[in-house]
Amino acid sequence: MLANFVEVFLARSGHHGAVGINLLTKLQLPNLASLHGAMLAGLNYVLMGAGIPREVPLVLDRIASHEMATLHFDVEGATAGDAHVLSFDPAAHGADVTRVLTRPQFLAIVAANSLAATLARKASGRACGFVVEGPTAGGHNAPARGTVPCRAPANRSTGNAWVIAARPNRSRTS
């Protein structure tokens, strides 16, 4: 929690631009506390891939509201009926629950249009868009399955990834 607070605090120093963090969904243990620390420092964007971050939008909603947040936790060798959950209560970690926390925008990092479609339908909260990675993006050793839907003129190519807005953010002025 402290490390992410410091990283975001320092990243915000000296400018008025947006700051985001990229967390790996598969590294489950630190994510709840990491998100809280970053949000306390004024985080603008959360990007998550390396797994299916279906629960993260709701986690962001709950942390911003100073409520208990939970994530399912994968346990190797667990049976199908076992439910393992990580939980994080901001109040239990000394959070000032009267302080207003801004919920950061959430971008899911995906390598296939089927995953983007699944997240758009089944995510537990609101995602503002997707980063669609190509097969040569960092850490990938196999081509993406399916096709990458990048026909919309609003899509922006960033080398081996495309940023695709799921819903326009109408609260901002350009």
Question: What does each of the following model-derived ranges do?
Answer:
Residues 172-174:
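Glycine-rich beta-strand-to-loop/alpha-helix junction loops that act as flexible
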Residues 1-170:
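Active-site entrance/lid segments in N-terminal catalytic domains of soluble metabolic enzymes
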